[in-house]
Amino acid sequence: MERTFLMVKPDGVQRGLIGEVITRFERRGFKMVASRFEKLPDARVMEHYAEHVQKPFFPGLKAYITSGPCFLMVWEGKDIVKISRDMIGATNPAGAAPGTIRGDYALEIGMNVIHGSDSVETANREIAIHFKPEELVSYTRIDEQYLYE
């Protein structure tokens, strides 16, 4: 089964949206295999956003991500990377469709509630940055027989 990394960012945490995010993914049939609530250290933010460190917007992004706690999660399911990106919506909330997390809850591109891995490769890298292998829990949902052919 495919895995992805999701993170409810500080604005989503402060606005009480963790439960909403979890509910949407559970109802879709995906299962959470790891989670942690923490304020991210600078070094890990720089590792996570390594491709953006030299960009002019990075200092603001780093200040925002470290401004409060985040809720980090690893989810598992068939085609979860693509489907989760569709559920999250466009990075810029102005272009995010209604019914997506960002379309329903985000107002600014800089504070857009949630991060989700954009490819299987990125998901594997981000999961390894934030979680040790032994922190990922393997289990079978009772309804899996009704979710997958």
UniProtKB/Swiss-Prot annotation:
GO MF, one annotated term: ATP binding
Binding of ATP, residues: 9, 57, 85, 91, 102, 112
Protein species of origin: Methanospirillum hungatei JF-1 (strain ATCC 27890 / DSM 864 / NBRC 100397 / JF-1)
Function: Major role in the synthesis of nucleoside triphosphates other than ATP. The ATP gamma phosphate is transferred to the NDP beta phosphate via a ping-pong mechanism, using a phosphorylated active-site intermediate.
InterPro entries, per the entry: NDK-like_dom, NDK-like_dom_sf, Nucleoside_diP_kinase, Nucleoside_diP_kinase_AS
Gene3D superfamilies: Nucleoside diphosphate kinase-like domain (3.30.70.141)
Entry-linked NCBIfam families: PRK00668.1
Keyword tags: ATP-binding, Cytoplasm, Kinase, Magnesium, Metal-binding, Nucleotide metabolism, Nucleotide-binding, Phosphoprotein, Transferase
Name of the protein described by the UniProt record: Nucleoside diphosphate kinase
Pfam families: NDK (PF00334)
Active-site residues, Swiss-Prot/TrEMBL: 115
